């Protein structure tokens, strides 16, 4: 259980509550969650963040009407900057997108600008939006995370409660290494509903070698942990930086979609460019 799970800032969210679905445009459906909720317990403030990054969203269920009433469909790509005051709560995002369904817009650019404006207002930060026609995406192969997968280890695990203990004394040797490690076993739970969130994670670092067994045990310990996707990624980045002290670190997770949306946060203190192709489970 997260220390802020019952924080009053979460009381007004539609997440976990019965809601009506509206199909006419309504920007008020969007709801933000202060990033400070999980950053404060980690000792992170807006002026001392040890990373840069973004939350990358893919919008698979995006439709509206053109000026003549003909339905349009697109796949949206949204990038929400890490410096925004709020993250976007995903159920409210879904409800907001549904409100486009029976609304007429003159052009695709009007839709893009509307999304960008509303998301910026909710997040209180910088947001970029791209819309893709389906033929732009057809035939694209399923992507994969570059790196060494650490999942196929012959180990026994019986603890699924979150702990940073595994990262203590998790580095060895004085030699600096540079490697990229991947796991598809990341599973956490929604902060509010406790529904499972499934993800793959890529950890790229330069520093003393990190013990792969201990790192995997740490990642598996998220299995009963309740936090939003973005919060988990920041926690993982902060914990590895704190206990393993790499010179450079990048953490990137791609989660399976829910409600027509997938969320793919990344945080880095290096020159990191995230690959945005969907993975096998997305």
Swiss-Prot record:
It comes from the Bacteria. It is found in: Cytoplasm. One of its GO terms (biological process) is queuosine biosynthetic process. It catalyses: 7-aminomethyl-7-carbaguanine + 2 NADP(+) = 7-cyano-7-deazaguanine + 2 NADPH + 3 H(+). One of its GO terms (molecular function) is preQ1 synthase activity. NADPH binds at residues 90-91, 258-259. The keyword Oxidoreductase applies. One of its GO terms (cellular component) is cytoplasm. The active site is at residues 190, 197. SUPFAM superfamilies: Tetrahydrobiopterin biosynthesis enzymes-like (SSF55620). Substrate binds at residues 88-90, 229-230. Its EC number is 1.7.1.13. It comes from Salmonella schwarzengrund (strain CVM19633). The keyword Oxidoreductase applies. Gene3D superfamilies: 3.30.1130.10. Homodimer. Belongs to the GTP cyclohydrolase I family. QueF type 2 subfamily. Catalyzes the NADPH-dependent reduction of 7-cyano-7-deazaguanine (preQ0) to 7-aminomethyl-7-deazaguanine (preQ1). Its main location: cytoplasm. Keywords: Cytoplasm, NADP, Oxidoreductase, Queuosine biosynthesis. This is NADPH-dependent 7-cyano-7-deazaguanine reductase. Pathway: tRNA modification; tRNA-queuosine biosynthesis.
